[in-house]
Regions:
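Surface-exposed binding/hinge segments that line
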Residues: 176
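Feature responds to low-complexity, polar/acidic, surface-exposed segments characteristic
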Residues: 2-32, 43-62, 66-94, 103-168, ...
């Protein structure tokens, strides 16, 4: 009987901690997304839903970082001209992707494609944020571990459960971007 009671108490303790952790992450996501909405970095879908649980594409993330950097309102004539085989001038995110690539924050794949409709992974998004913060491709180690380690070191992933090849959600991106805003640029 005592052993059963002890196991029940342990189980309740573990369940309450898991529930608290989920609630805590959801709060960080909501707070971060609210900041991004106020700054004009994150836009909702029709009806106002932010879709924080939805995966985010590479094109959507490029658009967010260009807004974050303030280039949306400035004239921009990137040199050298960067182009990707799968990104036409008619694509809705053509300019943000081109700007981010010209600035050196975004790189395409070895087949010279950008794959704008692919979901962005933790490794890809974190690499871009680390580059924006002033760290270049000369980080020690191999990609993506070198960027993931630098991100952890500078504190931009402290509120994320990073899974390298997993697609990020809009909520996760909000947390990453807001946590990056608190880091001094190199």
């Amino acid at each position: 009987m005592r052993k059963s009671l002890f196991l029940v108490i342990i189980a309740l303790f573990l369940i309450s901690n898991v529930a608290f952790a989920e609630t805590s992450h959801e709060k960080v996501e909501k707070d971060s997304s609210a900041i991004m909405v106020r700054l004009g970095l994150l836009k909702g879908y029709q009806g106002g839903d932010l879709g924080l649980e939805k995966k985010i594409t590479r094109a959507e993330f490029a658009t967010i970082i260009i807004r974050m950097l303030g280039y949306q309102a400035k004239p921009f004539n990137p040199k050298p001209k960067i182009s990707f085989k799968d990104l036409s001038k008619k694509h809705w995110a053509y300019m943000p992707v081109r700007m981010a690539a010209s600035l050196g924050y975004i790189k395409g794949y070895s087949d010279k494609k950008f794959k704008p409709s692919n979901n962005i992974t933790y490794s890809e998004a974190i690499t871009i944020m680390v580059r924006i913060l002033g760290y270049d491709d000369k980080l020690e180690g191999k990609w993506p571990d070198n960027y993931l380690n630098k991100a952890k070191e500078i504190g931009i992933t402290k509120n994320l459960d990073v899974v390298s090849k997993k697609a990020m959600t809009r909520g996760d991106i909000a947390v990453l971007v807001v946590d990056s805003m608190g880091v001094e640029m190199k």
